[in-house]
């Protein structure tokens, strides 16, 4: 039986201390994707987020990471590079998870495109799907070695594929040139007790790809991992070793 491997915040910090690669994260939220990079040995040196509660959560867990607050539409790549202490082309990974409600199979999809919507904290945003293009603009200004973006599975379905192709073309046009790949991955195949499917884009700068032997004909097979867990882990398996500590309990007062 596959065993769930829990980790602590200290585990994340210890792994990140290896500093195997550098990361700047946009749409960083409370630090979900940043945690993954840290567990892989990465150093997340700066992030962008504009929801105040998410910023508080992030800074509590990772106080050493520089936070560039604000709407990504008002930021430049130089703002993030300055916070990271890097020049264009030096960053290893630029990460981003632009809002995805416009493409979700649970949402209105194309009926909701080009309309005003409420974002994370209730803020009204026009054309929320275009925030993906703002992320690509930042990527073009930073010119990282690798660009990683995440979105819902629905972006690969139906009318949304028009937007998918628009994003792929935009990634492809970033100078000095990138190999653009995407794949739908399920978290359940990688040790997480959740059947969460997401579309991942991984774009590798040509000079970096050449050094490690990645070319357009083999990019998808080379870049994306195979499932690591032969059996999916259930919630009950993940919870079975949790310690019931009454001192750690906190009652929700405002309900």
Language model features with spans:
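Core alpha/beta nucleotide-donor-binding catalytic domains of modification enzymes
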Residues: 2-143, 153-157, 161-162
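Class I S-adenosyl-L-methionine
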Residues: 82-91, 101, 105-255
């Amino acid at each position: 039986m596959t065993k769930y491997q829990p980790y602590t915040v200290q585990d994340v910090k210890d792994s990140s201390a290896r500093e195997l690669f550098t990361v700047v994260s946009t749409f960083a939220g409370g630090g979900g994707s940043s945690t993954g990079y840290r567990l892989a040995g990465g150093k997340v040196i700066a992030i962008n987020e504009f929801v105040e509660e998410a910023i508080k959560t992030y800074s509590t867990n990772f106080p050493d990471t520089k936070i560039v607050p604000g709407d990504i539409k008002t930021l430049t790549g130089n703002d993030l590079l300055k916070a990271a202490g890097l020049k264009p082309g030096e960053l290893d990974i630029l990460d981003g998870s632009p809002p995805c409600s416009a493409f979700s199979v649970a949402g209105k999809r194309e009926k909701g495109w080009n309309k005003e919507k409420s974002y994370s904290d209730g803020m009204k945003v026009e054309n929320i799907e275009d925030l993906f293009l703002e992320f690509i603009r930042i990527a073009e200004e930073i010119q990282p070695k690798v660009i990683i973006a995440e979105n819902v599975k629905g972006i690969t379905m139906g009318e949304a594929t028009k937007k998918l192709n628009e994003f792929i073309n935009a990634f492809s046009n970033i100078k000095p040139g990138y190999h653009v790949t995407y794949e739908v991955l399920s978290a359940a195949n990688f040790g997480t007790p959740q059947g969460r499917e997401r579309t991942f884009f991984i774009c590798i700068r040509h000079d970096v790809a050449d050094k490690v032997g990645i070319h357009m004909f083999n990019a998808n097979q080379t870049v994306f991992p195979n499932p690591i867990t032969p059996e999916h882990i259930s919630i009950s398996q993940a919870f079975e070793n949790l310690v019931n500590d009454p001192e750690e309990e906190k009652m929700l007062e405002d309900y």
